[in-house]
UniProtKB/Swiss-Prot annotation:
Gene name for this UniProt entry: secG
Identification of the protein by name: Preprotein translocase subunit SecG
Cytoplasmic compartment residues: 1-30
Membrane disposition: Single-pass membrane protein
Species assigned in the record: Haloarcula marismortui (strain ATCC 43049 / DSM 3752 / JCM 8966 / VKM B-1809)
Topology feature Extracellular, residues: 51-53
Length: 53
């Protein structure tokens, strides 16, 4: 039983290393920008819905 428990950590080690690697070519967006965009989109939908009704 203990032999099957150790495989999970070893199999996920590659994923951890992959996601920990910092790539300089990636797009970096501040999380606050995502939240603000979502709020603005929601408000826009409310305004447009109020104009239609």
């Amino acid at each position: 039983m203990s032999g099957s428990d150790g495989g999970g950590l070893m199999s996920s080690a590659g994923l951890v290393r992959y996601f920990d690697a910092e790539d300089q070519n990636t797009i970096r967006i501040d999380p606050r920008t995502i939240v603000a965009t979502g709020v603005m989109f929601g408000l826009l939908m409310l305004v447009l819905n109020a104009m239609i009704v």
